[in-house]
Amino acid sequence: MTQPKLFLDMDNVLVDTLSVLNEIAMRQQSVEKPDQIPGIFRDLPPMPGAIEAVKQLATEYDIYVLSTAPWQNPSAWQDKLIWLQHYFGEDNTSPIYKRIILAHDKSVAHFGGGILVDDRPYHGASDWDDPDADSIWLQFGADPRLTWSNELVSFLLDVSQVQDVTDTLREAVAVVAERGHFYVHGDKTEFDKAHWE
């Protein structure tokens, strides 16, 4: 059977972005938005457990990275690719080799179905909750157990197995979420952003 598609956001899912940018925003009054600092995205630390999780999930999923970058920071686009190559490799042994999508509207990629793991509902992430496309948005950390260092990997591995016997990927997510009493995502319209976002 064909492997299901898994799309992973970078910021606050693979990369520990927000904690670093919030710290910079509190220290520096000269910067309106810390995400516009050239080079800022190149050296951010990975989220705990993220690198190992991607490698493990690549055995069950076709994995893609789906992220956005600030329009006012052209280096961010290149820096994100450099970050991914640093942690996952630059050749065809990488689980994400030539599977990187950078777009301001993440909904453009959902029509082929799949799961998007993203921490925030905006930039088209919540549009992935679409039964017609058999796509679903799983909000990273909305349920504190659904993080890399907790139960997210086992949740996604279970979804992959259940998907083999259900009609849709969305149904598989629903079955696994119900079985473990997982909260898949929060409110799609109300979300507390950092003060500088």
PLM region spans:
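Non-catalytic pre-domain segments flanking phosphatase-related domains
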Residues: 1-8, 171-197
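Substrate-recognition element of Asp-dependent hydrolases with the DxDx(T/V) motif
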Residues: 45, 50-78, 84
